[in-house]
Amino acid sequence: MCVFQILIIVTTIKVAGTANINHIDVPAGHSATTTIPRYPPVVDGTLYTETWTWIPNHCNETATGYVCLESAHCFTDLILGVSCMRYADEIVLRTDKFIVDAGSIKQIESLSLNGVPNIFLSTKASNKLEILNASLQNAGIYIRYSRNGTRTAKLDVVVVGVLGQARDRLPQMSSPMISSHADIKLSLKNFKALVYHVGDTINVSTAVILGPSPEIFTLEFRVLFLRYNPTCKFVTIYEPCIFHPKEPECITTAEQSVCHFASNIDILQIAAARSENCSTGYRRCIYDTAIDESVQARLTFIEPGIPSFKMKDVQVDDAGLYVVVALYNGRPSAWTYIYLSTVETYLNVYENYHKPGFGYKSFLQNSSIVDENEASDWSSSSIKRRNNGTIIYDILLTSLSIGAIIIVIVGGVCIAILIRRRRRRRTRGLFDEYPKYMTLPGNDLGGMNVPYDNTCSGNQVEYYQEKSAKMKRMGSGYTAWLKNDMPKIRKRLDLYH
């Protein structure tokens, strides 16, 4: 039987300089292959890692778009449909680790975690994604993460769509055989911030939720301290680095770690409590404790509420981030934090669920491979780019504000003019509605002694008939009183009679 390979559609879109999106549509029952070249390694002796993940076939609805998380942080990224975000999970397929040697890479470790039927991933000189006898269960998004040392991760995406077949059930994932180990439910709960006055005694309470375990185990709690630094705007905790502290991107210098909590290795450990023979049954955990000399006389664990602790006579230098890590059989399994500070030293704390270098900020970097000096200067250059974007945004916002003020002023003047004109028209209208003189008496009326009240309304015609003598041209002025509350209107009339 001959296998017919056909690649129907392959389009590549450059995304923010650090990612490629390949879109493949394959008819059901056919096969397709796409090759994704590797990024050239840079420094000999460094690690080069690749990880393939898969988001299942709920994610056929995809697109690329311009995303702005903040006014100055915008980038082009992959946009997924609502069904993808609601029903699908990103499944890790395999991870390969290489070492860079003379400009090439040599594989030193490979681990297949899950498998998708009819999908083959090649790990040779250049990666290949092969689809044989495609069915709808193969559809989805395949993502390759590539990283050389501690440099910015590269992202390659292959969106696979399968045409002309009814929906199959989701594939049965094949998992490798691994040694089983007992596990327990372990979590820590506490308040995340506490503000104190200098000289206070404070209690930091942490509740431990421990599920049942069939075996005797080792339980250890470590209290790590990241001191407050006035140059920090906020503090960031990189959660993956708590569970994998030896990852290259988690290990940083002391100067770089003043504002973020990454590897446990870089952070001062001020206290620890360890129990070798712990059980969730009738036996109670008995801990051996150790306190760092910097807080020896002031910090003590609260028993039996370990890892809760009490600190006496707290000072300004005690302000900062305290992270409690729980290790089950020597393996980090849970963690929590509390930020202790005075009012003046309070900072916000943000939890980041990626290792340093991942996430949307990595897309802001230039896509080209940089040398050592350029890599060390990335932080300052990205800050300059953000500042430039902020300046443009501020100028635009100021211009819009000035324009809005001008529009309000001009509109107010126009409204005032219209109101004034309307009042004049209303005044003239009221004057026209009230009785007025048909003709005005002159000084040569002779014996006529008609009161002014009789010249209005019903007596107007009568008065006009009685008048026979022609009046000479003269000027006269009279005041018309409309009402007590109405405005006074003076009208000059030139009479021609």
UniProtKB/Swiss-Prot annotation:
Intravirion side, ranges: 420-497
Membrane topology: Single-pass type I membrane protein; Single-pass membrane protein
Mod. after translation: Phosphorylated within the acidic cluster. Phosphorylation determines whether endocytosed viral gE traffics to the trans-Golgi network or recycles to the cell membrane.
Subcellular location(s) per record: Virion membrane; Host cell membrane; Host cell junction; Host Golgi apparatus membrane
Keywords: Glycoprotein, Host cell junction, Host cell membrane, Host endosome, Host Golgi apparatus, Host membrane, Membrane, Transmembrane, Transmembrane helix, Viral envelope protein, Virion
Residue ranges of the TM segments: 399-419
Pfam families assigned: Herpes_gE, Herpes_gE_N
Main location: virion
Residues bearing glycans: N60, N133, N148, N203, N277, N366, N388
Gene Ontology CC: host cell endosome membrane; host cell Golgi membrane; host cell junction; membrane; viral envelope; virion membrane
Function recorded in the entry: In epithelial cells, the heterodimer gE/gI is required for the cell-to-cell spread of the virus, by sorting nascent virions to cell junctions. Once the virus reaches the cell junctions, virus particles can spread to adjacent cells extremely rapidly through interactions with cellular receptors that accumulate at these junctions. Implicated in basolateral spread in polarized cells. In neuronal cells, gE/gI is essential for the anterograde spread of the infection throughout the host nervous system.
Subunit description: Interacts with gI.
Similarity comment: family membership: Belongs to the alphaherpesvirinae glycoprotein E family.
Protein name: Envelope glycoprotein E
Taxonomic lineage of the native organism: Viruses, Duplodnaviria, Heunggongvirae, Peploviricota, Herviviricetes
